[in-house]
């Protein structure tokens, strides 16, 4: 199953709201900037990966990467 930028943005938005954090507070805490945070939540495909990872970490969202060889081994 392919994960889309829109799905990642929706997860970030839902997590942020669930924590009671405003977009401005997230921008200040993560140091990424309000415009970037809003664009990422809206699923903008050209968002910088490093900043996106910073936001995920700030919100406590764990990202797991699985290589194709690991998938074939049932991992």
What do the PLM-derived regions correspond to, one by one?
Residues 1-18:
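A short, Lys/Arg-rich alpha-helix, primarily the initiator
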Residues 2, 45-49:
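Alpha-helix boundary/capping and short turn/kink residues
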Residues 11, 22, 48-51:
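Residues that mark the N-terminal boundary/hinge immediately upstream of a DNA-recognition element
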Residues 17, 28, 57:
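Short polybasic/polar patches that bind polyanions
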Residues 21-38:
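Short alpha-helical DNA-recognition segment
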Residues 45-46, 57, 64-75:
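Short, charged recognition helix plus adjacent turn
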Residues 52-56:
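Hydrophobic micro-packing sites on short alpha-helices
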């Amino acid at each position: 199953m392919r994960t889309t930028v829109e799905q990642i943005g929706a997860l970030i938005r839902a997590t942020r709201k669930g924590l009671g954090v405003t977009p401005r507070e997230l921008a200040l805490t993560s140091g990424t900037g309000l415009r970037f945070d809003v664009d990422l939540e809206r699923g903008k495909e050209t968002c910088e990966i490093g900043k996106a990872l910073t936001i995920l970490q700030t919100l406590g969202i764990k990202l797991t990467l699985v290589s194709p060889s690991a998938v074939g081994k049932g991992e």
